[in-house]
C-alpha cells in the first residue's frame, strides 16, 4: 500500500504535518493542528490517514550517541563473492542481526553494500569488522571510511 503513493497525492496540509512531526514526533495533535493551521479533528484524521497509508512508518526517540558512548561512526564498503539472489538474501538476513550496523544499503557500483557502523571507538569497530562483518555470508572484501565529524544527520 505505501509503495503505491507519491508525494503528489499529498496536499500542503499533509506535507506540513509530515514536516512538523519529522522535527518533533512527540507534539500533541492540538499542537500539531495549531502549527499546520487546521482544527484538531481534521488534523487528527489526516494524521491517522498518513499513518494508515504508510507515509509515517512510526515514531521514535532521537538518542544522543555521545551520551550513550557510541559516537564513533565508520562506513564500510562490502564486496560479496557471490551476488546471486540466495547469497544476497543470506547477507541481508545476517547483517540485520548486527546491532552495531545502523544502516545497510545495497549499492550499484564497485562494491555491493555500504554499511553505517556505530561503535564506542576504533578498537570496538575493528572487532565488529573482524568478527561480525567480515564473517557475513559471501563477504570477500571490505573497505572502511572513518567519520571525523558528523556535519548533518537527519531522517527525511
UniProtKB/Swiss-Prot annotation:
Gene: putR
Superkingdom classification of source: Bacteria
Function: Transcriptional activator of the putA gene in response to proline.
Protein name in UniProt: Proline dehydrogenase transcriptional activator
Database matches in SMART domains: HTH_ASNC
GO biological process, one term: alanine catabolic process
Record has Transcription as a keyword: yes
Gene3D superfamilies linked: 3.30.70.920, Winged helix-like DNA-binding domain superfamily/Winged helix DNA-binding domain
Organism: Rhizobium radiobacter (Agrobacterium tumefaciens)
